[in-house]
A protein has these predicted regions:
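An extracytoplasmic/periplasmic, membrane-proximal ligand-sensing/linker region
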Residues: 1-7, 154, 171-185, 189, ...
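Ligand-binding clefts/hinges and TM-proximal coupling segments of bilobed small-molecule sensing domains
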Residues: 126-137, 203-276
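Second-shell loop/turn segments in exported
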Residues: 16-23, 44-46, 56, 90-91, ...
Length: 343
């Protein structure tokens, strides 16, 4: 019995839960970190969240969740409309992570965001990161559509059938959601221009991202929003504090290995600040000990040569292809569900 308890404690001492709207990014982080930090007995448990705001609340209130991946604009919204007073004292950040791109896919009869006034546009589920971003951007541009709140795959089906005019999806590109769109469907991305809050920075969608929807000579202007790794501000003498601290040390020590493991992470900056929020103390101490400051952020960027970068993207493309093949197989071989009458 004692041996079983010791084994249980040993396993759980290195297990941390991390919540995000989608598990893809947390699985990637878990694989990268675990591969580099086996000697730290560190494992990540990816948890699919119920929405961006909910993910932040889960970090503060839900048992077994130590970290969350949350968009910067969602953090701003949480501060404007906190779930309880003093939220900034409980929720702290570890580091900036990667950016998510705002992708507006429209039907053939829509050529600009202005044309979406009064039209049916899907913003995703309420309290999701996409909903928060879409609401902010459309308000800033002075465009008021008829908003629907459907899951993204269902919204894409409705867009294909012409039942809605466009959908907004905030995710790293290229997104799996758009992988199977055919050229003859005439769906295309809308450019985002105009004055927007500083959380949103310019980026382009190119034919490298979506060969079937974007031509080589006509990249689409859009914007992106950063994501942040957040944690609960545990008391320093608590077991959970030690567990979070353990993760932070391993994460920062293996940062270059983690960055090099995935295309979307190879240039995120661990030193940049998140305005209005406090960095988790062990993370702040690690950066100071390493002599890193926001002004020196470029020293934390992985320097990949052309050959390495090509290899990285090739490996990522192979993983994506395998995932699509597996998804297609599951769909084809899905068992038939028979409904039984219990009466």
């Amino acid at each position: 019995m004692q041996l079983r308890h010791q084994l249980r404690d040993q396993i759980n001492s290195g297990l941390v839960g991390i919540v995000s709207e989608g598990t893809d990014e947390t699985v990637d982080m878990a694989l990268a970190l675990t591969a580099q930090a086996d000697h730290d007995r560190l494992r990540l448990l990816p948890i699919a969240g119920a929405g961006a705001s909910q993910s932040a609340e889960d970090v503060m209130l839900t048992r077994g969740i130590d970290f969350g991946i949350v968009q910067i604009d969602v953090l701003d919204e949480i501060k404007r409309n906190p779930p309880f007073p003093g939220v900034e004292n409980y929720l702290q950040y570890i580091t900036h992570l990667y950016d998510r791109q705002v992708q507006i896919l429209a039907g053939p009869d829509i050529q600009s965001i202005d044309e979406l006034r009064g039209k049916n546009v899907n913003f995703g589920l309420r309290d999701s990161g996409t909903y928060t971003t879409a609401t902010t951007i459309f308000k800033a541009l002075g465009v008021e559509p008829d908003v629907t709140n459907l899951p993204h795959p269902l919204a894409l089906d409705k867009l294909r059938r012409g039942e809605i005019s466009a959908l907004v999806y905030v995710a790293t590109k290229p997104s799996r959601l758009f992988q199977d769109i055919r050229p003859d469907e005439n769906l295309h991305f809308l450019p985002i221009t105009g004055s927007l809050p500083t959380n949103y920075t310019p980026i382009t969608i190119t034919s490298n991202d979506y060969p079937e929807q974007v031509s080589n000579d006509a990249p689409v202007k859009t914007v992106q929003v950063g994501t942040v790794l957040v944690a609960y501000n545990w008391p320093t003498n608590s077991e959970r504090y030690q567990r979070v601290n353990h993760f932070v040390q391993a994460f920062f020590e293996h940062i270059k290995d983690i960055q090099a493991s995935h295309p979307k992470w190879h240039q995120f900056d661990i030193t940049s600040l998140v305005s209005g929020w406090t960095r988790f103390s062990p993370a702040e101490q690690w950066l100071k000990k390493a002599g890193l400051t926001p002004e020196e952020s470029k020293t934390t960027v992985v320097d990949l040569d052309t050959k390495q970068r090509e290899g990285l993207f090739k490996d990522f493309a192979q993983r994506e292809a395998l995932f699509r093949e597996f998804a297609a197989y599951q769909k084809e071989h899905r068992p038939t569900i028979v409904a039984y009458d219990n009466h």
